[in-house]
Amino acid sequence: MDVLLGAAAVAAYGAIAGYLVLNGAPNVDEGFYGLTARAAVSGLVPYHDFGYTQMPLFPYVHGAVSRLVGFGPVEQRMASGLWALLAVAVGTVFLWRRFGRAVGIGFAALLVTTLNWVYFTHLPKTYAFVGAVILVNIVILEARADFRGRMFWTSLLGVVAVGSRLPVAPFYAVVWLGLLSRDFSAANLLRALGWPAVFTLGLLAPFAAAAPRPFLFWALDFPWQSAALKYWRLDLPALFYFAPAVCLAALALGIAILSGRVRLARTRDVVLLGLLVALACNVLPVGAYEEYATPLLPGLALVLCATLGDLGIGARVVGAFYLVLCLVNLCGIPPIDPTYYADTRKASLYVRQFQRGAFPFVGSASVVALEAGRPVDPRMLMGSFCCTEDYPESQANLLRLMTPAGIAAHMEDPRCEVFVLYNRANWNFVWSMPRFQPISASAVSRWKAILSRDFRLEYGDAHYAVYVRRGVYEGK
């Protein structure tokens, strides 16, 4: 029976994940995550050789997996999904062994039916990997009682997680303080300070040393300056729609804890507090999106399920509870776009046909460069987010950014035979980094003039516009 249940769970997850890999709506970030991963495993260094809006470790992790499966958009989604699968598997096995089949299978069902979580963890972003790291860390904290082991693994995995996605730092700050406060001694303080310092020096310091100014710009200045100009706030109904069952269960657990009906196991209270603090820091500030909760959901689900397991409720009641939660989850539907991958393949065929030689791909639709297997100027790896009018040419080059003049020079180069744009205006070169102010009308007019004079529209669909240089088109 256990084997059959496990096989059914794997089949259900595979069906949902496979559908969303092929039919999930495109995300503007997919191109630059894939290009930076490809660049990192080819020998280029984040910040020193190319711009990158996150901390530096993820391109190497994602690039290593993508090297096995491929760098196309579908392969990128599959590579990211492997980390989501790891999180589901580790959490399920841990809970199954400790609390029984019902709790373990329930955890898997809870995550797999959170369709927005499945969708966003199968985009080539940091969410799936960082979520898996956090979940593994929580499992270690649940399984080990010694301070040394807990702090060592929390320090190592914390540097890996924060070194991939900075906004999860509040979780590790709370857990670090909680672990130290409960087992405080001079020796433990030395360990708590020493291990994070050693891992930070080993994993992150080399990037800062290689390119100090670009490192500070991309890792700290860019998110700070860009966030200052965002004006929207995420409302709580949007968060509940994103992950209905996890949010509802967390609310119920919070009420039970505050009323004194439930007491959390040692260390689990610190973990839950860390997750909630990190969740608040990620979704409450101005300019937040509900997807920022994605890497925290597996850990939150594991804490909820482990607490349910501690209550010792019968398997049938637990199963009924999970069934209700899974039905609630069906209220949150991710964005679907069945034509995205087919259109990307078509656009890439035109790039392969008309772009001769090794001249880099030019255009904002960087995901097409991935599908076509084309090289890209390191200053343009960020795709839609590579252009700046905030800095002069010399400083932009230092920060590995393009200027409008640099893009125009690429367009006017006779070796640039194809130019590809998105058919969504705000996904193109419309924002000046990092302040997200509109690119000047004069720069846009110059680009349009070059496009009209030197190129013709060869292919267009709902997602892309592929322009081919006139002489090249006539020669074909």
Task: Indicate where each model-derived feature is located.
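Hydrophobic, aromatic-rich transmembrane alpha-helices
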Residues: A89, F242-R268, L272-L279
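Specific aromatic-rich, kink-prone transmembrane helix
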Residues: V90, L110, F129-D146, F152-G158, ...
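Membrane-interface alpha helices of multi-pass inner-membrane proteins
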Residues: A108, L135, R150-L166, Y172-G178, ...
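Short acidic/glycine- and proline-prone juxtamembrane loop motifs at membrane-interface regions
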Residues: N27, H122-F129, Y289-E290
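Extracytoplasmic
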Residues: P167, L325-G475
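Perimembrane helix-loop-helix junctions
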Residues: M151, F171-V198, G254-L264, L302, ...
